[in-house]
Design a protein with these regions (language model features):
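A short, acidic, amphipathic alpha-helical segment used as a generic capping/interface helix at domain edges
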Residues: 109-113, 149-162
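Basic (Lys/Arg-enriched) interaction patch that binds polyanionic ligands
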Residues: 46-81
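Mobile active-site "lid"/loop adjacent to the S-adenosyl-L-methionine
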Residues: 126-157
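Residues at the starts of beta-strands that form the adenosine-phosphate
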Residues: 47, 68, 102, 167-168
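Conserved proline-anchored active-site loop of SAM-dependent methyltransferases
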Residues: 48-61, 119-138
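S-adenosyl-L-methionine
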Residues: 1-48, 56, 64, 68-123, 190-194, ...
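Conserved Class I SAM-dependent methyltransferase catalytic core
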Residues: 154-201
């Protein structure tokens, strides 16, 4: 019997199965909170920059609803995982090829890239403060945190997103936590049980 703890499976991104596929099929479409937060409504499908691409799930969902999505990821390892996942989804063909055809992946720091992109809508989902009961945090998110760190520049990123967006910036954050000090007050919020979207309007759409 080995004295070593079991190895955690390597981080893997897959847009064609599991939770991502379930959310695409049964998540509620444009009625769900994320879609409403970015401004989707009948006849309106904004172009979106996901400034913190991470595992790409929000980007994939938004693209599945018809949006053109530009993902920005600065971490080398996560960027490589995303590129691989996009390629595999494209190779899967059918609806997956159509969806990832609306997704573009950029490698770089969103704070510097956002002013060059002139985005209508910017989505920001920075690494959140660790929860008090860390054992309850999904192993996958612990892996992501171990790779990307804590996003110590999150206030600068949110500020840059608000400044760059021509219509709205959206910050995804735990429902019961206040935004970091230094972030302005949102125009409005869309809150669920565990997640809140703080919306900063730049232009009434």
């Amino acid at each position: 019997m080995s004295d070593h703890p079991p190895q955690r499976p390597p981080l893997f991104i897959d847009f064609t199965s599991g939770a991502v596929e379930h959310r695409r099929r049964f998540g509620g479409g444009r009625a769900q909170a994320l879609a409403r937060a970015v401004g989707m409504k009948p006849g309106v499908t904004p172009a979106i920059v996901d400034a913190t691409a991470g595992l790409g799930r929000d980007s994939f969902l938004l693209a599945s609803l018809g949006a053109e999505v530009t993902m920005v990821e600065r971490n080398d390892a996560i960027h490589a995982l995303l590129a691989d996942a996009l390629a595999r989804a494209h190779d899967a063909g059918g609806v997956y090829r159509d969806i990832v055809g609306r997704m573009r992946l950029l490698h770089g720091d969103a704070i510097r890239l956002l002013p060059t992109l002139a985005p209508a809508v910017v989505l920001v989902d920075p690494m959140h403060p660790p929860r008090g009961k860390s054992a309850l945090v999904k192993a996958e998110m612990r892996q992501v945190r171990s790779i990307v760190g804590t996003d110590d520049d999150k206030v600068m990123l949110i500020t840059a997103a608000i400044a760059a967006a021509t219509k709205r910036a959206v910050v995804k954050w735990p429902a019961k936590l206040p935004l970091p000090a230094g972030v302005p007050t949102a125009s409005h919020q869309i809150a669920g049980k565990t997640t809140r979207y703080d919306v900063f309007m730049r232009h009434r759409d």
